[in-house]
Every structure is written in structure tokens, then in C-alpha cells.
Amino acid sequence: MNMHTDFRFHPQVTQIGTYWGEKGHTELYLLEGDGLAVIDTGCVDAPERFIAPALKERGSDLKDVQLILNTHGHFDHAGGNASVVAASACEVWMPAQDAVVAGDLDQQFDEFYLQDSQLTDRSHMAEAAKADWKKLCEPSPVNRRLQAGEVLSLGRGMELRVVPTPGHTLGSVCFYWEREGFLFTGDSIAGGGSRPGGLPVIYHPQDYERSMDLVETLDINVLCLGHHYVSLSLPSESVKFGRIGKRFIQESRELARVIAGAMESAVDGRLGSPFLDAAVAALTKIQERLPVVLNSETGLPVDGGTSALYSNWLRYTGASSAFATRI
């Protein structure tokens, strides 16, 4: 069993590493303003296994948490919200567009994860996959739906601006502490993906590219990521300082363009180009830049990234759904 890992890199900020499933890992951030706040809560057991021990080392407990800030509504970032609320009666503030899927697990699975089974001809296994997935999270309450540009005052000089960064989800945001140059990103800046051999999880590629444009206009000293992301040339540490952080943003943009360009070439504007054929052709080009490991049966990445291929397939074929035509 993985033990909790803490990294206090600022007097008011501590990173808390959490683990879930066989290979899953999510980074949370404890903020110390006038009270205690956490950015994201991980999966359902993360509060007890990882957040509580980190708080105990500081003489606090889960009941002392006053606020949860979510970067988006996915299970590995908001799946522990309900547990923290049960212990502390704290409020949950979440991007408005992600609040629904955080509270409705069936909708979240169907919108984001069902396609993996469908695209790999495993639809018959989808219900079992959903049942296993639901063990990782609980529906999240939401007290406040955050809007782009809001400034959240947490006290002791900690004011966080809500920066809209759709791409991973439509509602994804970063929290920008302008005074210190800290950007808390969740999954908004995804490098080459969080699992070696996979691809970044991008459901809305055009939005993702625009989000990279926006992020590059910010004065960032410390990039606080939601996972240990792979990149082209940098170590996988999830807190990146100075020029390393800026380089990671550039590489994230570059890799997104590599994936998009490879899929555009693969479909060559042909409406109805079968997804699997296009994906295999695109991956041949992508592997020239990123060491993607492929499943011998499906020809797709063994460890995630189908979304980046599928969303770009939709983008360049003009198809409305991969499942309305032959995959």
C-alpha cells in the first residue's frame, strides 16, 4: 500500500500525493489562508489515506478543512469530496460546467469513459467496468459554481483567480495565485499524459489549444500539476519551477499539435474514415515524437489516450459520433 507523500514548497502550500487503482496517482494541494482549503480531493479513499495524515502532521484534522476547490469534476479529483464534507461540513466550489458530472456518476462515466469500451469493441464489458469505476468515487455536492475571472479570497494574501482552461473537460479551470505566480492546473496542462506509454486525455482539442494560448500569457513562477505528466524532455515532477514550468507548457502545446496533425493527415478530410484505421495511421506518426506503447490486439495505446485520438478524429472527419457509423 502506498504511503502518503507531502511536499511543502511554500509556507502556505503543501502538495499531497495520492494513489488509486493499479497505477493511478493524483496530486492535491493544501492551502493555508485564514483557514484550510484543498484543491481537489482525489478518489473516494484519498481523504482518509492521504489528506488526513498530511493534516495530522500539521496538528489538524479533516474536520478543520473549510473549503474544497475543484479544478474539474472527474472522479480522481472530486471523488473524495463527499468524504471531506462528511468529516468537516466544508463547502465545495467547482467550475459550473463540471458540477453536473461530479454529482451524477452515471453521466460522468457515459460521457467520458464509456467510449473506451466502445472504441475497442468491448461494449459487452462496459457495465462491469462502470461498477468497478464507481468504487473509486462518490457523487459530489456543490455549494458554489465558479465562473471564469472570479477572484477567491482565502486570507493571508492568498487570492486565487479562476482561469478558464477547457480542453480536458469543458469546465476545467486553473487557479492562479498572481502574487506568487502559482498556477494550480488539475488536468488542464497534460504534457504527454500521466501514464508512460499513453497519450494526454484531451476531450476538446481546439479548446485545449486555446487554453494553452491563455496560460502562456500568465506570469507563472510555479506550475502545480495534477499528475506526474510525461513530456518530451523534462522530468516528471508534478511541481515545476521557473523556466521548467514554462517549457512544460510549450511541450504540452507541441504534443497536442502533433496528435492533431497526425490525425488530420490520417483522415485527409475523408468523411466517414473509420476511426480505428485512422487511429492506427496517426499513431505511427505520433510514435516518432512520443514513445506510445500499443495494445497488440486493438492497436491503440495500452494506457490511455483514446480520447485525444477520438476527439481529433471527430474534428477532422466532421462526424458527430463515432458510434453512429462504422468505427
Predicted regions and their residues:
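Metallo-beta-lactamase
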Residues: 43-46, 151, 159-247
